A protein has these predicted regions:
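Short, histidine-centered active-site or binding-site loop motifs used for metal coordination
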Residues: 32-35, 64-66, 131
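Radical SAM/AdoMet-radical enzyme domain recognition
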Residues: 47-63, 72-173
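Pocket-edge positions in alpha/beta enzyme catalytic cores
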Residues: 37-41, 68, 135
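Short, motif-level signal for alpha-helix interfacial/capping segments enriched in acidic residues
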Residues: 1-4, 45-49
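N-terminal [4Fe-4S]-dependent radical SAM core
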Residues: 1-17, 55-56
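Canonical Radical SAM [4Fe-4S] cluster-binding loop centered on the CxxxCxxC motif
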Residues: 10-44
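Short acidic donor-binding/metal-coordinating loop in glycosyltransferase active sites
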Residues: 20, 66-67
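Short, charge-rich binding segments
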Residues: 6-10, 30, 85, 107-108
């Protein structure tokens, strides 16, 4: 894998999506992640990708993704600390289902200027049909607990909604 990264010709990379793991604690109906490798991205691979994206010296976005990226929080922290040490002009983003957010994680993300997007596909009755826990029950309660952690810590977040035939007719706005 390292040799593949080294052989990529570097152009100005505007956005680097780091899929920190294929693992997820949910089993969403439409998700492709269940078909992917469930291994964790190593910190070495993550840092090599960041160096490649930073090579142009221009501002770029690093988005932590997955599966559920907070399942590999150690790699996320390593990247965040490395970006700070190197003073890379990176904008940091996390796309999460929110269920693993704790006060400690939320404060770390806030202090390190990691923007947070939480996935929610509509009102609970609709979201629970699309976003489910591994036991088959709806995940809305877990997602809302994560959003509450952010609210309690005065941390703003964005919401990401996957529009499907199940929710398109009931979304407002």
């Amino acid at each position: 894998m390292q040799s593949e990264i080294n052989n990529v010709q570097t152009h100005k990379i505007k956005m680097l999506v780091l899929s920190l793991t294929g693992k997820c604690n949910f089993a969403c109906r439409y998700c492709y992640a269940v078909e992917h490798d469930r291994s964790m991205m190593t910190e070495n691979i993550a840092l090599a990708a960041v160096r490649m994206a930073a090579a142009s010296g221009e501002k770029f976005v690093i988005q932590f993704s997955g599966g559920e990226p907070l399942l590999n929080f150690a790699a996320l922290q390593t990247v965040v600390e490395y970006v700070k040490e190197q003073k890379y002009p990176a904008i940091l983003q996390l796309q999460t289902n929110g269920s693993l957010l704790t006060d400690k994680i939320a404060q770390y993300l806030y202090q390190n200027k990691v923007a947070i997007g939480v996935s929610l596909d509509g009102r609970p009755t609709v979201n629970n049909k699309l976003r489910m826990k591994r036991n088959g029950y709806g995940a809305t309660g877990d997602i809302l607990k994560g959003i509450e952690v952010l609210r309690r810590n005065n941390i703003a977040c964005g919401l990401t909604c996957v529009v499907t035939s199940t929710n398109v007719g009931v979304l407002e706005g």
